[in-house]
Design a protein with these regions (language model features):
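Extended, Lys/Arg-enriched charged tracts that mediate electrostatic binding to polyanionic substrates
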Residues: 128-138, 142
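Helix-start/capping segments and mature chain N-termini
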Residues: 1-119, 147-359
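Intrinsically disordered, low-complexity linker/loop segments enriched in Gly/Pro
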Residues: 122, 142-144
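Charged, gly/pro-rich active-site loop segments
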Residues: 109-111, 119-132
Protein backbone atom coordinates (compact mmCIF):
# COMPACT_ATOMS: atom_id res chain seq x y z
CA UNK A 1 0.00 0.00 0.00
CA UNK A 2 1.22 3.47 -0.86
CA UNK A 3 1.97 5.98 1.88
CA UNK A 4 0.45 9.02 0.18
CA UNK A 5 1.37 12.42 1.56
CA UNK A 6 -1.14 15.18 0.86
CA UNK A 7 -0.43 18.89 0.50
CA UNK A 8 -3.65 20.78 -0.12
CA UNK A 9 -3.81 23.94 -2.16
CA UNK A 10 -4.12 27.27 -0.39
CA UNK A 11 -5.57 28.85 -3.54
CA UNK A 12 -8.48 26.68 -4.70
CA UNK A 13 -9.77 27.28 -8.21
CA UNK A 14 -13.28 28.41 -8.95
CA UNK A 15 -15.38 25.44 -9.94
CA UNK A 16 -17.41 25.56 -13.16
CA UNK A 17 -20.75 27.31 -12.66
CA UNK A 18 -22.45 25.87 -15.74
CA UNK A 19 -21.85 22.13 -16.02
CA UNK A 20 -23.58 22.01 -19.39
CA UNK A 21 -20.60 23.87 -20.89
CA UNK A 22 -17.73 21.84 -19.47
CA UNK A 23 -16.42 20.43 -22.73
CA UNK A 24 -13.62 17.87 -22.49
CA UNK A 25 -10.23 18.31 -20.85
CA UNK A 26 -10.35 22.09 -20.72
CA UNK A 27 -10.37 22.82 -16.99
CA UNK A 28 -8.42 20.91 -14.37
CA UNK A 29 -8.94 20.31 -10.67
CA UNK A 30 -6.95 21.70 -7.74
CA UNK A 31 -4.60 18.78 -7.18
CA UNK A 32 -2.62 16.07 -8.91
CA UNK A 33 -1.06 12.80 -7.82
CA UNK A 34 2.69 12.44 -8.39
CA UNK A 35 5.17 9.61 -7.77
CA UNK A 36 8.80 9.30 -8.86
CA UNK A 37 10.87 6.40 -10.11
CA UNK A 38 14.62 6.15 -9.72
CA UNK A 39 16.63 3.14 -10.85
CA UNK A 40 17.72 1.20 -7.79
CA UNK A 41 15.09 2.81 -5.58
CA UNK A 42 11.95 2.00 -7.53
CA UNK A 43 8.71 3.97 -7.24
CA UNK A 44 8.76 6.35 -4.28
CA UNK A 45 7.43 9.59 -2.77
CA UNK A 46 3.74 9.13 -3.54
CA UNK A 47 2.03 12.45 -2.99
CA UNK A 48 -0.98 14.60 -3.82
CA UNK A 49 0.01 18.20 -4.39
CA UNK A 50 -1.50 21.37 -5.88
CA UNK A 51 -1.87 21.18 -9.66
CA UNK A 52 1.20 22.81 -11.23
CA UNK A 53 3.55 22.56 -14.23
CA UNK A 54 6.60 20.28 -14.20
CA UNK A 55 9.97 22.03 -14.63
CA UNK A 56 11.65 19.95 -17.33
CA UNK A 57 14.98 20.31 -19.13
CA UNK A 58 14.65 20.76 -22.92
CA UNK A 59 16.71 17.58 -23.33
CA UNK A 60 14.29 15.46 -21.27
CA UNK A 61 14.02 12.24 -23.27
CA UNK A 62 10.22 12.13 -23.44
CA UNK A 63 10.29 15.24 -25.65
CA UNK A 64 12.52 13.49 -28.17
CA UNK A 65 11.71 9.77 -28.09
CA UNK A 66 8.16 9.67 -26.70
CA UNK A 67 8.76 7.15 -23.93
CA UNK A 68 5.41 7.64 -22.21
CA UNK A 69 2.06 5.95 -21.63
CA UNK A 70 -1.34 7.01 -20.35
CA UNK A 71 -4.79 5.83 -19.34
CA UNK A 72 -8.29 7.27 -19.50
CA UNK A 73 -11.09 6.66 -17.00
CA UNK A 74 -13.92 8.47 -15.22
CA UNK A 75 -15.47 9.07 -11.81
CA UNK A 76 -19.25 9.38 -11.60
CA UNK A 77 -21.60 11.00 -9.08
CA UNK A 78 -24.82 9.12 -8.34
CA UNK A 79 -28.13 10.61 -7.22
CA UNK A 80 -27.24 9.93 -3.57
CA UNK A 81 -23.84 11.67 -3.96
CA UNK A 82 -21.81 8.47 -4.03
CA UNK A 83 -18.66 8.86 -6.13
CA UNK A 84 -17.75 5.73 -8.05
CA UNK A 85 -15.33 4.30 -10.59
CA UNK A 86 -15.92 1.77 -13.36
CA UNK A 87 -13.61 -1.27 -13.46
CA UNK A 88 -10.43 0.62 -12.46
CA UNK A 89 -8.51 -2.64 -12.11
CA UNK A 90 -8.86 -3.14 -15.88
CA UNK A 91 -7.19 0.20 -16.53
CA UNK A 92 -4.46 -0.75 -14.05
CA UNK A 93 -3.71 -3.99 -15.90
CA UNK A 94 -3.69 -2.30 -19.29
CA UNK A 95 -1.37 0.38 -17.89
CA UNK A 96 1.03 -2.41 -16.91
CA UNK A 97 0.87 -3.90 -20.41
CA UNK A 98 1.60 -0.51 -21.95
CA UNK A 99 4.49 0.01 -19.53
CA UNK A 100 6.00 -3.36 -20.40
CA UNK A 101 5.95 -2.59 -24.15
CA UNK A 102 7.52 0.86 -23.67
CA UNK A 103 10.20 -0.42 -21.23
CA UNK A 104 8.70 1.60 -18.37
CA UNK A 105 8.73 0.24 -14.78
CA UNK A 106 5.29 -1.12 -13.92
CA UNK A 107 2.98 0.32 -11.28
CA UNK A 108 1.46 -2.49 -9.15
CA UNK A 109 -2.25 -2.82 -9.87
CA UNK A 110 -3.29 -2.12 -6.27
CA UNK A 111 -1.05 0.99 -6.13
CA UNK A 112 -2.54 2.35 -9.36
CA UNK A 113 -6.09 1.92 -8.08
CA UNK A 114 -5.20 3.37 -4.67
CA UNK A 115 -3.63 6.43 -6.28
CA UNK A 116 -6.70 7.02 -8.47
CA UNK A 117 -9.09 6.57 -5.55
CA UNK A 118 -7.06 8.89 -3.31
CA UNK A 119 -6.98 11.73 -5.84
CA UNK A 120 -10.67 11.35 -6.68
CA UNK A 121 -11.47 11.37 -2.96
CA UNK A 122 -9.52 14.61 -2.47
CA UNK A 123 -11.22 16.11 -5.55
CA UNK A 124 -14.72 14.69 -4.97
CA UNK A 125 -16.26 18.18 -4.95
CA UNK A 126 -15.11 18.50 -8.56
CA UNK A 127 -17.16 15.52 -9.74
CA UNK A 128 -20.04 17.10 -11.71
CA UNK A 129 -23.64 16.81 -10.52
CA UNK A 130 -25.19 17.14 -13.98
CA UNK A 131 -26.58 13.99 -15.58
CA UNK A 132 -24.11 12.59 -18.10
CA UNK A 133 -21.18 14.69 -16.88
CA UNK A 134 -18.24 13.09 -15.09
CA UNK A 135 -14.73 13.64 -13.77
CA UNK A 136 -12.28 12.49 -16.42
CA UNK A 137 -9.13 10.93 -14.95
CA UNK A 138 -5.83 10.88 -16.84
CA UNK A 139 -3.01 8.76 -15.33
CA UNK A 140 0.28 8.91 -17.23
CA UNK A 141 3.98 8.10 -16.95
CA UNK A 142 6.80 9.81 -18.79
CA UNK A 143 10.56 9.33 -18.93
CA UNK A 144 12.49 12.24 -17.47
CA UNK A 145 16.16 11.41 -17.93
CA UNK A 146 18.08 14.29 -19.49
CA UNK A 147 20.10 13.42 -22.59
CA UNK A 148 19.78 12.59 -26.27
CA UNK A 149 20.78 8.95 -26.24
CA UNK A 150 18.11 6.49 -27.39
CA UNK A 151 17.59 4.10 -24.48
CA UNK A 152 15.16 3.39 -21.66
CA UNK A 153 15.19 6.11 -19.04
CA UNK A 154 16.36 5.51 -15.48
CA UNK A 155 13.96 8.10 -14.06
CA UNK A 156 10.19 8.46 -14.52
CA UNK A 157 7.28 10.47 -13.20
CA UNK A 158 3.85 8.94 -12.64
CA UNK A 159 1.14 11.58 -12.52
CA UNK A 160 -2.65 11.66 -12.40
CA UNK A 161 -4.69 14.73 -13.31
CA UNK A 162 -8.46 15.20 -13.42
CA UNK A 163 -10.80 17.32 -15.51
CA UNK A 164 -14.56 17.75 -15.04
CA UNK A 165 -16.07 16.87 -18.40
CA UNK A 166 -19.50 17.45 -19.89
CA UNK A 167 -21.97 14.93 -21.24
CA UNK A 168 -20.68 13.45 -24.50
CA UNK A 169 -24.19 13.50 -25.97
CA UNK A 170 -25.44 16.81 -24.61
CA UNK A 171 -28.15 16.95 -27.29
CA UNK A 172 -28.94 13.25 -27.53
CA UNK A 173 -27.20 10.36 -29.26
CA UNK A 174 -26.72 11.18 -32.92
CA UNK A 175 -25.23 8.47 -35.18
CA UNK A 176 -22.10 9.53 -37.06
CA UNK A 177 -20.56 9.11 -40.52
CA UNK A 178 -17.29 7.15 -40.74
CA UNK A 179 -14.56 7.22 -43.40
CA UNK A 180 -12.74 3.93 -44.00
CA UNK A 181 -9.04 4.81 -44.26
CA UNK A 182 -7.15 2.73 -46.83
CA UNK A 183 -3.92 4.73 -47.18
CA UNK A 184 -2.67 5.54 -43.69
CA UNK A 185 -2.52 2.90 -40.96
CA UNK A 186 -2.80 3.08 -37.19
CA UNK A 187 -0.84 -0.02 -36.20
CA UNK A 188 1.02 -3.06 -37.50
CA UNK A 189 2.06 -6.38 -35.96
CA UNK A 190 4.94 -6.04 -33.52
CA UNK A 191 4.40 -2.34 -32.89
CA UNK A 192 2.47 -0.54 -30.14
CA UNK A 193 -1.15 -0.72 -31.32
CA UNK A 194 -2.32 -2.52 -28.18
CA UNK A 195 -0.89 0.15 -25.87
CA UNK A 196 -2.05 3.61 -24.87
CA UNK A 197 0.96 5.67 -25.85
CA UNK A 198 1.00 9.11 -27.37
CA UNK A 199 2.73 8.07 -30.57
CA UNK A 200 -0.28 6.00 -31.64
CA UNK A 201 -2.53 9.02 -31.33
CA UNK A 202 -0.11 11.49 -32.94
CA UNK A 203 0.18 9.20 -35.97
CA UNK A 204 -3.61 9.12 -36.35
CA UNK A 205 -4.13 12.89 -36.54
CA UNK A 206 -3.36 13.27 -40.26
CA UNK A 207 -6.01 10.78 -41.41
CA UNK A 208 -8.49 12.15 -38.89
CA UNK A 209 -8.11 15.69 -40.19
CA UNK A 210 -8.53 14.59 -43.80
CA UNK A 211 -11.71 12.69 -42.91
CA UNK A 212 -13.07 15.65 -40.97
CA UNK A 213 -12.48 17.93 -43.96
CA UNK A 214 -14.79 15.64 -45.95
CA UNK A 215 -17.51 15.75 -43.32
CA UNK A 216 -16.80 12.49 -41.49
CA UNK A 217 -16.66 12.23 -37.71
CA UNK A 218 -14.08 9.47 -37.43
CA UNK A 219 -11.71 7.20 -39.33
CA UNK A 220 -12.18 3.44 -39.47
CA UNK A 221 -8.73 1.90 -39.45
CA UNK A 222 -7.85 -1.21 -41.44
CA UNK A 223 -5.04 -3.63 -40.65
CA UNK A 224 -1.54 -2.44 -41.45
CA UNK A 225 -0.48 -5.40 -43.61
CA UNK A 226 -3.22 -6.16 -46.14
CA UNK A 227 -5.39 -3.10 -45.48
CA UNK A 228 -8.54 -5.18 -45.71
CA UNK A 229 -9.54 -6.13 -42.15
CA UNK A 230 -11.26 -3.66 -39.81
CA UNK A 231 -9.53 -2.80 -36.53
CA UNK A 232 -10.59 0.39 -34.70
CA UNK A 233 -12.55 3.57 -35.30
CA UNK A 234 -10.87 6.83 -34.28
CA UNK A 235 -9.78 6.22 -30.71
CA UNK A 236 -12.46 3.60 -30.04
CA UNK A 237 -13.05 -0.08 -30.63
CA UNK A 238 -15.82 -0.89 -33.10
CA UNK A 239 -18.49 -3.58 -33.41
CA UNK A 240 -20.73 -4.70 -36.27
CA UNK A 241 -24.08 -6.46 -35.88
CA UNK A 242 -24.54 -8.53 -39.03
CA UNK A 243 -27.49 -10.86 -39.49
CA UNK A 244 -28.02 -11.18 -35.73
CA UNK A 245 -24.38 -11.75 -34.74
CA UNK A 246 -21.90 -9.20 -33.38
CA UNK A 247 -18.40 -9.01 -34.85
CA UNK A 248 -15.36 -7.13 -33.58
CA UNK A 249 -11.62 -7.24 -34.19
CA UNK A 250 -9.63 -9.47 -31.86
CA UNK A 251 -7.15 -7.78 -29.53
CA UNK A 252 -4.08 -9.59 -30.82
CA UNK A 253 -1.45 -6.84 -30.70
CA UNK A 254 -2.70 -4.17 -33.09
CA UNK A 255 -5.99 -3.33 -31.37
CA UNK A 256 -6.36 -1.60 -28.00
CA UNK A 257 -8.06 -3.90 -25.46
CA UNK A 258 -10.73 -1.40 -24.45
CA UNK A 259 -12.41 -1.65 -21.06
CA UNK A 260 -15.73 -0.57 -22.60
CA UNK A 261 -15.23 -3.09 -25.42
CA UNK A 262 -14.67 -5.89 -22.92
CA UNK A 263 -17.70 -4.84 -20.89
CA UNK A 264 -19.97 -4.67 -23.95
CA UNK A 265 -18.87 -8.13 -25.05
CA UNK A 266 -19.68 -9.55 -21.61
CA UNK A 267 -23.12 -7.93 -21.64
CA UNK A 268 -23.88 -9.09 -25.18
CA UNK A 269 -23.02 -12.67 -24.28
CA UNK A 270 -25.21 -12.40 -21.16
CA UNK A 271 -28.07 -11.34 -23.44
CA UNK A 272 -27.60 -14.36 -25.68
CA UNK A 273 -25.79 -12.81 -28.64
CA UNK A 274 -23.05 -14.61 -30.51
CA UNK A 275 -19.96 -12.37 -30.37
CA UNK A 276 -17.22 -13.23 -32.86
CA UNK A 277 -13.76 -11.78 -32.14
CA UNK A 278 -11.52 -12.16 -35.16
CA UNK A 279 -10.76 -10.91 -38.65
CA UNK A 280 -13.59 -9.15 -40.47
CA UNK A 281 -12.94 -7.84 -43.98
CA UNK A 282 -14.28 -4.42 -44.91
CA UNK A 283 -15.40 -5.95 -48.23
CA UNK A 284 -17.61 -8.41 -46.34
CA UNK A 285 -19.10 -5.58 -44.29
CA UNK A 286 -19.97 -3.63 -47.42
CA UNK A 287 -21.47 -6.76 -48.98
CA UNK A 288 -23.58 -7.29 -45.86
CA UNK A 289 -24.81 -3.71 -46.23
CA UNK A 290 -25.78 -4.34 -49.86
CA UNK A 291 -27.75 -7.40 -48.78
CA UNK A 292 -29.49 -5.53 -45.96
CA UNK A 293 -27.77 -7.61 -43.28
CA UNK A 294 -25.63 -4.86 -41.71
CA UNK A 295 -28.01 -4.06 -38.87
CA UNK A 296 -25.95 -1.94 -36.46
CA UNK A 297 -22.46 -0.48 -36.17
CA UNK A 298 -21.13 1.22 -33.05
CA UNK A 299 -17.88 2.34 -31.46
CA UNK A 300 -17.07 1.69 -27.81
CA UNK A 301 -14.83 3.77 -25.56
CA UNK A 302 -14.49 5.63 -22.28
CA UNK A 303 -15.49 9.05 -23.61
CA UNK A 304 -18.63 8.19 -25.58
CA UNK A 305 -19.34 4.79 -23.97
CA UNK A 306 -21.19 3.66 -27.12
CA UNK A 307 -21.22 5.69 -30.34
CA UNK A 308 -23.65 4.62 -33.11
CA UNK A 309 -22.62 4.79 -36.77
CA UNK A 310 -25.09 5.61 -39.53
CA UNK A 311 -22.82 5.54 -42.58
CA UNK A 312 -19.56 4.01 -43.79
CA UNK A 313 -17.75 5.07 -46.94
CA UNK A 314 -15.03 2.93 -48.53
CA UNK A 315 -13.48 3.55 -51.93
CA UNK A 316 -16.37 5.83 -52.85
CA UNK A 317 -19.10 3.35 -51.88
CA UNK A 318 -21.51 4.33 -49.12
CA UNK A 319 -23.10 1.88 -46.70
CA UNK A 320 -26.08 3.21 -44.75
CA UNK A 321 -26.98 1.62 -41.44
CA UNK A 322 -30.28 1.54 -39.56
CA UNK A 323 -32.04 4.35 -41.42
CA UNK A 324 -29.67 6.77 -39.71
CA UNK A 325 -31.03 5.98 -36.25
CA UNK A 326 -29.49 4.31 -33.21
CA UNK A 327 -30.16 0.57 -33.19
CA UNK A 328 -31.84 -1.33 -30.34
CA UNK A 329 -28.72 -3.25 -29.28
CA UNK A 330 -26.60 -0.10 -29.34
CA UNK A 331 -29.22 1.71 -27.26
CA UNK A 332 -29.49 -1.15 -24.76
CA UNK A 333 -25.72 -1.26 -24.31
CA UNK A 334 -25.55 2.49 -23.79
CA UNK A 335 -28.43 2.49 -21.31
CA UNK A 336 -27.01 -0.44 -19.36
CA UNK A 337 -23.44 0.83 -19.20
CA UNK A 338 -24.34 4.39 -18.26
CA UNK A 339 -27.04 3.15 -15.91
CA UNK A 340 -24.46 1.23 -13.89
CA UNK A 341 -21.87 4.00 -14.07
CA UNK A 342 -24.23 6.66 -12.71
CA UNK A 343 -25.97 4.29 -10.28
CA UNK A 344 -29.34 4.33 -12.02
CA UNK A 345 -29.57 0.56 -12.27
CA UNK A 346 -28.10 -2.19 -10.07
CA UNK A 347 -24.53 -3.26 -10.74
CA UNK A 348 -25.11 -6.95 -11.38
CA UNK A 349 -21.58 -7.50 -12.70
CA UNK A 350 -19.47 -6.21 -9.81
CA UNK A 351 -17.89 -3.55 -12.00
CA UNK A 352 -18.54 -0.49 -9.82
CA UNK A 353 -16.03 0.64 -7.18
CA UNK A 354 -17.31 3.31 -4.75
CA UNK A 355 -14.70 5.86 -3.66
CA UNK A 356 -14.69 5.95 0.12
CA UNK A 357 -14.05 9.12 2.10
CA UNK A 358 -10.56 8.51 3.49
CA UNK A 359 -8.60 11.62 2.71
Amino acid sequence: MLDIKITRTTSPKEKPQDETKLGFGKKFTDHMFVMDYTEGEGWHDARIVPYAPFPLDPATVVFHYAQEIFEGMKAYRTADDTIQLFRPECNARRFQDSADRLCIPKIPEEDFVQAVEALVDVERDWVPHTDGASLYIRPFIFANDVGLGVHASKHYIFCIICAPSGAYYAEGINPVRIYVEDEYIRAAPGLTGFTKCGGNYAASIKAGELAEEQGYAQVLWLDGVEKKYVEEVGSMNIMFKIDGKVYTAATVGTVLPGVTRRSCIELLKDWGYDVIEGKLAIADIMQAAREGKLEEVFGTGTAAVVSPVKELVWKGEHAYIGDGKIGPVTQKLYDTMTGMQWGKIPDTKGWIVPVEKKY
